[in-house]
Structures are given as C-alpha cells and as structure tokens.
Amino acid sequence: MSDERTFIAIKPDGVQRGLISQILSRFESRGYKLVGIKLVTPTENLLKQHYAEHVEKPFFPKMLAYMTSGPILATVWEGKDVVKQGRVILGATNPLNSAPGTIRGDFALDMGRNVCHGSDSVESAQREIDLWFKKEELVDWKLNQLSWIYE
C-alpha cells in the first residue's frame, strides 16, 4: 500500500451540476482512500497561490471569476500511483480530447468548464494539499478493503 496523495477539486460547474457523488465514486471504485474533503468558496488569494504559474496569463481573470463563482469540493486521495492515475481518471484538461469513460470525457465539453482539477505531480500535490488543507483536516484511517485491492 502506498501513502502517495493527490489533490482533486470539483470545480463550481461540477458542484452546480450535481456531479459530486459520481466523481467521488470514480476514485472510491478504483480503490483510492479519501483522507480529506471540504466544501469551500475559495478566496482570490488562495487561487492566486494555487494557480501561481497562470497569474500573468490573459485568461487568468476570467478563470479567477469562474473559480470564485461558487463552492468547490476540495478532496485529498491516497493510494498507489494516485497522482498519475488520478489524472487518467479525470481525462485530458481539454474535455474534447478526453476519452469516454473519463470524468471530463463523460461530463464536460469546454476547457473553461472542465469540472475538476487534479494535481499533475507528487510535488504539486503536496503543495496544493498544504494550500487547501490544515494538517489536522486530513484523516489517517484504515481502509479495511485494502487486502482486496493490493497484493
């Protein structure tokens, strides 16, 4: 069993469209363990830190307005290769390039409303988890089905 963690956020469009349970179930069904979850409306400051590499880009003001337009479900998942596999479960950033069966391939059509965010590396995951969650908000617990998932 791996203790690798990733940050997955269901963006305002995913929350407003009632997709939370379907998205969470994709990760649970795969065998990943949920260790952090909260519904938040992020501040501009938090989003500027989260998307620091995009702050100077022309699309950033529109993205910032969208990401502060409603609640986001912030989650932390744990398990073997969860960062890479989380990206596979989500699908390509541009939903039109996402395969059917992925979250974005099934639920999104527009890159500006692509339902979810997922960490793109182990390092990014740790940075994002630290931004969105306090240490005491993450729960270390035993998933009893682990022996049915891992050798």
From Swiss-Prot:
Domain of life of the source: Eukaryota
SUPFAM superfamilies named in the record: Nucleoside diphosphate kinase, NDK
Entry GO terms, CC: cytosol; mitochondrial intermembrane space
Keyword Protease applies: no
EC number: 2.7.4.6
Active site residues of this protein: H117 (pros-phosphohistidine intermediate)
Sequence positions that bind ATP: K11, F59, R87, T93, R104, N114
Pfam families: NDK (PF00334)
KW Transmembrane (keyword) present: no
Reaction(s) catalysed by this chain's protein: a 2'-deoxyribonucleoside 5'-diphosphate + ATP = a 2'-deoxyribonucleoside 5'-triphosphate + ADP; a ribonucleoside 5'-diphosphate + ATP = a ribonucleoside 5'-triphosphate + ADP
Example GO BP: CTP biosynthetic process
CDD domains assigned: NDPk_I
Cofactor(s), names only, from the UniProt record: Mg(2+)
Molecular function GO terms recorded: ATP binding; metal ion binding; nucleoside diphosphate kinase activity
InterPro entries (UniProt xref): NDK-like_dom (IPR034907), NDK-like_dom_sf (IPR036850), Nucleoside_diP_kinase (IPR001564), Nucleoside_diP_kinase_AS (IPR023005)
Keywords from the UniProt entry: ATP-binding, Kinase, Magnesium, Metal-binding, Nucleotide metabolism, Nucleotide-binding, Phosphoprotein, Transferase
Function, as annotated: Major role in the synthesis of nucleoside triphosphates other than ATP. The ATP gamma phosphate is transferred to the NDP beta phosphate via a ping-pong mechanism, using a phosphorylated active-site intermediate.
Family, similarity comment: Belongs to the NDK family.
Name of the molecule in the record: Nucleoside diphosphate kinase
Taxonomic placement: Eukaryota, Fungi, Dikarya, Ascomycota, Saccharomycotina
Gene designation per UniProt: NDK1
